[in-house]
Amino acid sequence: MFRKFLFIPLLIVTSLVKAEIIEVDSLSKITQDFKVNYNKNYLPQDLLVVTVLDKFLFKPFGIPIGEYIDQRRYLELAPLFSQINKNSKIIYIAQLILTNDSYKKELQESDFPSFVNEISNSQIPIIAVNNGFTGNFNNIPKFEIWFADYLKKNFYIDFSKSFPNNNYIIFNNLDSFANTYPVFYKGILTSNNISVAQVILNFLIQINFIPKCFILISSNRELIRSMEFQLNNHSSNILFIGYHYNNKTISAHKDIVYYTKMINDLIPQINKLKRNNPPLKNNNAKSKNSYETHK
């Protein structure tokens, strides 16, 4: 009787969560769910919150790459797109824009820093994931260190309170890319051309932490489904909750002159982009932070 009593409500909750992804267009719904549900029904150490920053952290930069533009504009810009798309360095364009002060960065959610701080101060582990590339990037010695410092200094966003005993991990058990690997640094996972879901699961295995309730916030529906699949394959005891963040605010379309100037400005920057990452002499994932000397 006792087992049946426990099983029925758990089954109901699980089926409700997995029936569909929870659609949100702001952080307010997620914040409310913490107050009403998670904080009351779970111990802090039984939870894990993962925020996928790409297309969630900042408002669009106004770059016509990865954004919708109408057919007429696309046809007029096609020759410029061709110049960029055939460049092998196109994969770095988001990181190039992020590290260039010429492009204004504005948070999608002005209360995101408060959200992160509130979760952290509640002793609930919260980490972030970004699709960037680790190691040297132009004049930045180590992008993953720069990015964590940049968020803390400019936006008061700090994930370093989570897993302080594992503040730096090089995932050299995963595939390398240009002599670099995915890295966990001060609460931020940088995926380095590896599947985000794979990197997250690898991180959990590496630090030997499996939460009872895994909460993922992302603007990518496919990633949410992939993460749920990965976790289900790894353990049937994890309650997965995916929030699909979909802010429907559409930025005004710029004219052709604006887009043309923007792309022409980016092309020489992409061509000049440099990465110099010799193989690490000691890339043991459990070793001392070999990047700290570059900070």
Curated annotation (Swiss-Prot):
Pfam family, one: DUF2608
Low complexity compositional bias, start-end: 276-288
Region (Disordered): 274-295
Keywords, comma-separated and alphabetical: Signal
InterPro entries the record matches: DUF2608
Protein's UniProt keywords contain Signal: yes
Signal peptide start and end residues: 1-19
Protein name: Uncharacterized protein RT0286
